[in-house]
Amino acid sequence: MEQPLPTAAAEAAAAGGDGEAYRIRPLELADISRGFLGLLNQLSPSPPLTEEAFRARFEELAALGADHLVLVAEDAATGRLAAAGAVLVERKFIRRCGRVGHVEDVVVDAAARGRGLGERVVRRLVEHARGRGCYKVIINCTPELTGFYAKCGFVEKNVQMGLYF
């Protein structure tokens, strides 16, 4: 049987308040046929992913339980996905073995932008991280997106650096 990612904690994070047009819910295996990979490709163009590779990664993330949550916004009329985002909970030694939420891979389909879907997905991810006991939630973004994330309650802090392979 197909299970959403990751479980009941994800359902709590996704529940309520999104009206009739879109339902925000955890990622499911069947979402590969609802446009999930095409949606991610709008964020970061990538080579095609096979269904087998998608299934393997889905199962790997599901094994992490509530420490990794992928939410999607599903169009109630068409069943297609219009937005997605993820949060990963990092377990630390500092702050008395505290936890930090990392928001990643937030994307809204080009045809669905301007409807508040991105903000609703991000707010649900933040609430999930709060519920997991995170003392902060962070996101790295381009300068063009700082205004969007400010609307979601984030403030500019520090400098992001990266090393890509």
UniProtKB/Swiss-Prot annotation:
Compartment(s) of residence: Endoplasmic reticulum membrane
Domain N-acetyltransferase: 22-165
Membrane topology qualifier: Peripheral membrane protein
CC annotations in GO: endoplasmic reticulum membrane
The keyword Metal-binding is annotated on this UniProt entry: no
Annotated tissue distribution: Highly expressed in the root elongation zone and at lower levels in leaves and grains.
PROSITE patterns according to UniProt: GNAT
CDD domains: NAT_SF
GO biological process: N-acetylglucosamine biosynthetic process; root development; UDP-N-acetylglucosamine biosynthetic process
Pfam families reported for this sequence: Acetyltransf_1 (PF00583)
Zinc among keywords: no
Disruption phenotype: Short roots, disruption of microtubules and shrinkage of cells in the root elongation zone.
Catalytic function, reaction form: D-glucosamine 6-phosphate + acetyl-CoA = N-acetyl-D-glucosamine 6-phosphate + CoA + H(+)
Domain of life: Eukaryota
EC number(s) per entry: 2.3.1.4
Main location: endoplasmic reticulum
Keywords: Acyltransferase, Endoplasmic reticulum, Membrane, Transferase
GO MF assignments: glucosamine 6-phosphate N-acetyltransferase activity
Amino-acid positions noted as binding substrate in the UniProt annotation, renumbered to this chain: S44, K92, F93, I94, R95, E104, D105, V106, Y135, K136
UniProt subunit comment: Homodimer.
Protein name: Glucosamine 6-phosphate N-acetyltransferase 1
Organism: Oryza sativa subsp. japonica (Rice)
Gene coding for it: GNA1
